[in-house]
Amino acid sequence: MSISLDDLASNMNFTTGGKSKAGGVTFLPEPERRKRDYTIISADDHIVEPPHTFEGRLPAKLADRAPKVIEKEDGSETWVYDGMEIPNVGFNAVVGRPVSEYSFEPARFDEMRRGAWDINARVADMDLNGIYASVNFPSFLPGF
C-alpha cells in the first residue's frame, strides 16, 4: 500500500499508527549500499540517546541522580530522573519503518532501528546511504 504526502496531510491519524497487524513493529528491508559520487552531509538528523548515555559520566556524588532507562510493568521503557518519567517518543525513531506504523506512542529500544540510537549502527546506515557526515539533534531529555 502506497501512502502519499497528500494522504498524510489530510489525515493525521498516521501519528498513532503504532504496531503492525502482527503485533510487533515492521522494519523495511535493508537498502542496497549507495555509490557515493560526491560528498553528502546531512544537516538535519535526529538521534535518540542510548540507554547507557549517562552511565559513568557524572561525578560519583550525582551518579544516583543520573537519567536511566527502566522497563515498566507493562513492558514499556522510559527514562527516569528527578522524579519524572520521560518516554522515548516513537516518532523520534521511525526510520526504516512503514508510514502506517509511525506513532507518537512510547517506544522500546528494540522497536527502533538500531541506527537511531547506536553510533556504530548509525555509521553503518550512513555508509549504506552514501552519507559522509551528519549534524545530529537530540531527542527530548529536558535539563540535559
Regions found by a protein language model. Name each.
Residues 1-144:
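Helix-coil boundary/capping segments in enzymes
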